[in-house]
Amino acid sequence: MLIWVGLTNNELTGLNHTGVLNIAPTRGQLRAFQGASLLFTADSVKVSPGLVLVAAGKRYQASAPVVFKSDCGRFQITSLRRAGIAQPVYEGNLRVHSASRSLRLSLELSLDSYMQGVLAAEMPASYHAEALKGQALCARTYALRPRLPHDQDLVNVCDSYLCCQYFAGHGASLDPRIKAAIEGTAGQVLVHDEKPILALFSSNAGGHTENYENCFSDPVTGAFPPPPLPYLKGVPEGNYPGLKAPVGSEQFLAYLYSNSGLGTKLCADNWSPKFHFHHRITADSLEAHLHHNIEKLMDDRESAPYVIPPAGSGRGRFGHIKRFQVLKRGVSGVAIELAIETNLGQWRVQKELLIRKVFANPDAGIKRLNSARIFFQQKYDKLGLLAGLEVSGLGFGHGVGFQQQGAQGLALAGMNYKQILSHYFPGARIAQY
């Protein structure tokens, strides 16, 4: 099976490339086709917006998408950067076309070749074989049903973890453990009602996974919360010895955080450093940065509806921060509505990702919080004014569906990949596509 993958820009934020592309095969030559016609054969090519091609000292003006094929089946785009890879290598055929004064790149390759790149980027090859197999099924299924449709982009998926799943190209060689995971699950996908499921995954759920509808908007309508998906329900990652608080409460999060020393006796993902995090932020630093974060969210068309200012204030002054309060939590304890009390009224922020972004703070080294499964300790001075904030949290990522480090913990405890997937996607089953 062949699929098309959209290659995003260096920031992984969009499909449009505004600079000059340098494309070269890893060995042999590169052939450029427009339709069925061969334009040229060369050692390398530079492509500028407007589909201006320069190769072997000659200039070509293309009027339609150009497809590049290399003799060896591999090529580099030396102007692209991916995390940890200066010049990613790709297998397959590359299609380049114009799009509003920029270029768009899409890669045609086999589904298995795509999965090799995804698994290498998403999960360490050193993980247990059964955890790797579980990730392989998630990657294969997600390629068939991404959360956000890319039909208008003429691709099946994109390569960005900000939108789909991370595909950073291909290394010089494929780790045999990744190859074994792909081959050991050949043709297998996860289905519900005989259709591929939305196989979401994240790094670490912090002791309990979360319901889909508490973390994501509807991909078509944008509505939040969206209709629930029966196989994306939050599940516990342990037996929680000695727990007295209700699961999902703030006290539950504090219990997990304070008992992290119990290791896997507590839960399957507790072995990882990503299980919990802690930040201290001074009041001065909060005042300096938080209102700017709110402004950025309100300036963004997609996030603006989920930032609610005090009644009657419109987009007026933010005010001085008095306290933070989580108004609504999901089944795992994830914050899905946050109140920020100021002297000018109460601001509310909805959705876990936006709540994480609100706390971006260069002074504290925070780009965004690792997760929104958070609780606070707020400190006040003698005048009763906020002096500082401590944010404690659990997990890394949205925590919906398959969680990689929990899967590793379950595999080490003796579960096979089918049992692991049944745990994370209740009601789904494995089928041949």
What residue spans do the PLM features occupy?
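Conserved, single-site charged/polar hotspot
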Residues: M1-Y433
